[in-house]
A protein has these predicted regions:
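Basic/aromatic DNA-contact patch characteristic of tyrosine site-specific recombinases
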Residues: 1-73
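Compositionally biased accessory segments in Actinobacterial proteins
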Residues: 1-3, 140, 144, 158, ...
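Intrinsically disordered, low-complexity segments enriched in Ser/Pro/Gly/Ala and basic residues
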Residues: 11, 136-137, 166
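A detector of helix-start/N-cap boundary segments at the beginnings of structured domains
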Residues: 33-34, 80, 166-169
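A generic short alpha-helical patch detector that favors 3-5-residue windows
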Residues: 39, 63-64, 82-85, 172
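Long, amphipathic, Lys/Arg-enriched alpha-helical "connector/arm" segment
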Residues: 148-178
């Protein structure tokens, strides 16, 4: 990527409109705009489908929108659109959001939430026939049994970062610390 600012195209204005002219829950389904126009009609369909797939809280809908908009702005700066993203773009985005010394660096938990939002977007895009393959790679992981359920093998998005759980954090007495 070189020096910051090199290799980036001029960025268009991509924003979130948190309310739309509709009744009920649809009023809280965000719109993604480029300037004064809808960014992409298929992306809008994704947001309209979120309540049907269990995302009903207006706070969750808003979080999805802002996660997606930051990604769209990044892609726009790279000269790409939402449905043209590749695994290399995800890697570059990770460097920008997690590893650079930039002011906009985010926590692992925030990164994982953004990955979950984008993963859902691209899985939806695959189901709708908009893309052949999502820009994320997956690997099989063992999910241990919980609450009487059997353990199973599941596909895990490689872009997720491991976040320390409270059970992983232990007190170490000073005598044991070296």
């Amino acid at each position: 990527w070189g020096v910051r600012g090199e290799g980036f195209a001029p960025v268009s204005i991509i924003t979130v409109c948190e309310r739309r002219e509709a009744k009920g829950l649809d009023a809280h389904v965000p719109l993604i705009l480029r300037g004064d126009a809808l960014y992409d009609p298929d992306l809008d369909r994704f947001f309209l489908d979120l309540p049907l797939s269990g995302v009903r809280s207006r706070h969750s809908l808003r979080a999805y929108a802002y996660d997606v908009v930051v990604w769209l702005r990044f892609l726009d700066a790279c000269g790409k659109t939402v449905w043209a993203a590749t695994r290399d773009d995800v890697d570059a985005y990770h460097r920008e959001r997690r590893r650079d010394d930039a002011d906009h660096r985010i926590t692992a938990a925030s990164w994982n939430r953004a990955v979950a939002s984008l993963d859902r977007l691209y899985r939806w895009g695959e189901q709708q026939g908009l893309i052949a393959d999502a820009p994320f790679s997956r690997r099989a992981v063992w999910r241990p049994a919980q609450g009487g359920r059997r353990g199973m093998i599941a596909a895990r998005n490689d872009a997720y970062e491991r976040v320390a759980r409270r059970s992983d954090v232990r007190f170490v007495p000073m005598d044991d610390y070296r």
